[in-house]
């Protein structure tokens, strides 16, 4: 019995995403085309591969068994295709990245625009999200986060310069409530608190390994919303210097406790496994590495 390999590719996409619509987005097909492909495969195999309801799709026992048995072979085929892609004069494919919103805004977008100019046959899909998502489960090639929150079992590469966090508020706030002179003084101020999507609040870290659990009436899980709240005078924020530079230059915000602020490792791009690295990710890492080498050479003393 001859099988259509594209139907198996559709089967794997639906199994990974547990959704016809998400599988269609991944493969560039409509939900009806996905449904037709799965129905055709089930008819040829004479087994039901998925349990379907109006709200969910899940593998049957037979479907789960087929998925687990065939997945190593399909992974190997994908690796071989990616390796063949390396022989092309111009690599092709899709690069899917999940990044923190602030990273996309302050440096990642310029990197990706330059990358797509150099590799016009690679399509880039960027999703911005301040939560620490499971990039493998969500189908991303890589993620971009601050190094301090990248999971230890991931392979990571520095993608940006060191970052500096600034304690900042509006001049009006400081005129009304005074300026903190020591990090412990922040406990007597209204602070705009950033909270991770997990619910854990971000503690403000300073020199001399000092960490302050600030408090305030406004708790947010979005760094852009945090900045807006600080600009509206809601309290003191702890924000990336690159994020607020324009507001410092125009006087809308002021920094305090600068002697306590320290540089820390910046953003990293991370991914799960070198063996299964997509052609797009491999090309992007090479592009980033080449740019870093050129930058270091420009700043090397003559």
From Swiss-Prot:
DNA-binding feature ranges: 20-40
GO terms, biological process: DNA-templated transcription
Similarity remark: Belongs to the LysR transcriptional regulatory family.
Name listed for the protein in its UniProt record: Uncharacterized HTH-type transcriptional regulator YcaN
Gene Ontology molecular function, alphabetical: DNA-binding transcription factor activity; sequence-specific DNA binding
Keyword DNA-binding: yes
Record Gene3D superfamilies: 3.40.190.290, Winged helix-like DNA-binding domain superfamily/Winged helix DNA-binding domain
Any Pfam family matching the protein: LysR_substrate
